[in-house]
């Protein structure tokens, strides 16, 4: 048996090394869980085959780069990890979102000109119906996963118009101002 003074320093050293090892394991697990690019599966989204990893009721996966640099920058501002979140749609296929936080999927809407698709009050009926179609497809996918949908919109006027429009059409989407 070790003398008393040696036992306590030996125990402290052992505890310290166990603590360091535990911290390392926690860090390694966190990096693996959160690391973009560590993909284990593939899904088909439209014409694209996307590398993904399961998370919650959907998948984190590769983000498709946008041709317009402003739109691309806006999406990266919403999710700097350069990934998208994909939810399966109940009727097949997947719905893509820019981000997912606390069971809320987020979709970015960058308004680049006054005559925008998202200034719904100024749009003809066929354009309004396209907005409703997109919103309902997102709600169907999110609802099946027990998630909420939030649109992050870069223009305050569009935020107000979409909020009223969704209220009138009983569309449960949170519309939030999110500047460029």
Each model region followed by its residue ranges:
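Generic serine detector
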Residues: 8-13, 24, 84, 103, ...
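Residue-level marker of positions within ordered structural domains that often coincide
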Residues: 1, 104, 143
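Active-site or metal-binding loop neighborhoods of secreted/extracellular toxin and effector enzymes
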Residues: 26-38, 42-49, 57-64, 68, ...
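Generic hydrophobic secondary-structure signal
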Residues: 4, 78, 91, 97-100, ...
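Glycine-rich short-loop/terminal segments
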Residues: 27-124
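Short, solvent-exposed coil/turn elements at secondary-structure transition points
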Residues: 15, 111, 179-180
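Hydrophobic, gly/ala-rich membrane-insertion helices/peptides used by toxins and envelope proteins
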Residues: 1-44
């Amino acid at each position: 048996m070790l003398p008393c003074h040696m036992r306590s320093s030996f125990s402290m050293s052992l505890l310290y090394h166990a603590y360091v090892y535990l911290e390392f394991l926690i860090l390694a697990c966190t990096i693996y869980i959160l690391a973009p690019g560590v993909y284990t599966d593939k899904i088909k989204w439209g014409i694209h085959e996307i590398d993904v990893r399961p998370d919650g009721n959907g998948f984190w996966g590769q983000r498709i780069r946008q041709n317009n640099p402003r739109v691309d920058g806006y999406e990266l501002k919403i999710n700097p990890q350069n990934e998208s979140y994909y939810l399966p749609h109940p009727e097949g296929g997947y719905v893509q979102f820019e981000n997912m936080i606390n069971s809320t999927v987020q979709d970015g809407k960058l308004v680049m000109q006054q005559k925008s698709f998202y200034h719904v009050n100024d749009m003809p009926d066929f354009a309004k119906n396209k907005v409703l179609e997109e919103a309902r497809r997102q709600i169907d996918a999110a609802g099946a996963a027990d998630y909420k949908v939030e649109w992050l919109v870069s223009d305050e006027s569009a935020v107000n118009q979409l909020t009223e429009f969704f209220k009138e059409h009983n569309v449960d989407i949170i519309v939030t101002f999110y500047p460029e």
